[in-house]
Design a protein with these regions (language model features):
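Membrane-embedded alpha-helical bundles of multi-pass transporters/translocases
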Residues: 2-224
Length: 224
């Protein structure tokens, strides 16, 4: 007989979901505040900024499948290993975000700084996001519990979006950097105390093209 899973409490939800706040906080300033900052403070054209943002984001998107496979390997090794990588990624998210708004260079070197900062921030953000979401997926449970897990993560993310829409504009980018760093520390700290999945036996990985055989999956991609 298998032992019933422990109920997923509100405290469990907060410990798992809290990291969703800083993860949601990151994106809005990069897409809304950063272009205006570089245009006003450094005189960079919006077209150039858009090209750099698009190029670095495309690179990150191309690497996402590899990040996912690496996350699977981390969890197969141990949850502690995944948590360690998440903590390191959180440090680079905070450093990259702060560096983007405190560029010490001008001219062509400034664009290099911008591209490097975006690559570091995007990649670290992707690693942290994939680990966080995989952590929640591995908690398992019935449909009701899985819904609660996602609701806590996305609910905390909603607060992150609201904070990101106010803090940089009202209090400045230094305050935004401080809020991001502090909430990352709290989020990773709470994640370390959140429920963990039991060790799972997994078979060989499925073929990468398998999702394309699903009509609902193809319909979902059509939205994008």
């Amino acid at each position: 007989m298998t032992r019933a899973a422990a109920p997923f409490t509100a405290w469990d939800g907060l410990r798992y979901g809290a990291l969703g706040l800083p993860l949601a906080f990151v994106a809005l300033p990069l897409y809304v505040v950063l272009p205006g900052h570089y245009a006003e403070q450094h005189g960079v054209s919006l077209a150039t900024l858009g090209a750099v943002l698009l190029g670095t984001r495309a690179l990150d998107a191309a690497l996402d499948p590899a990040i996912g496979r690496a996350a699977d390997a981390l969890f197969a090794r141990s949850t502690r290993a995944a948590l360690t990588v998440a903590a390191i990624a959180a440090v680079f998210v905070a450093l990259g975000f702060t560096a983007l708004f405190h560029a010490p260079l001008e001219g062509a070197a400034l664009l290099g700084w911008l591209a490097a900062g975006l690559i570091v921030t995007y990649l670290a953000f992707s690693v942290l996001t994939v680990v966080h979401q995989a952590w929640g997926a591995r908690l398992g449970g019935d449909a009701s519990q899985r819904s609660r897990v996602v609701a806590w993560r996305e609910g905390c993310g909603l607060f992150g979006v609201l904070a990101a829409s106010v803090i940089p504009l009202q209090f400045g980018v230094d305050a935004a950097s401080a809020v991001l760093a502090s909430t990352l520390v709290v989020g990773v700290g709470l994640l370390a105390q959140s429920p963990r999945s039991a060790a799972q036996r997994t078979g060989p990985p499925a073929h990468w093209a398998l999702p394309w055989r699903s009509a609902p999956f193809r319909a979902l991609l059509a939205v994008f």
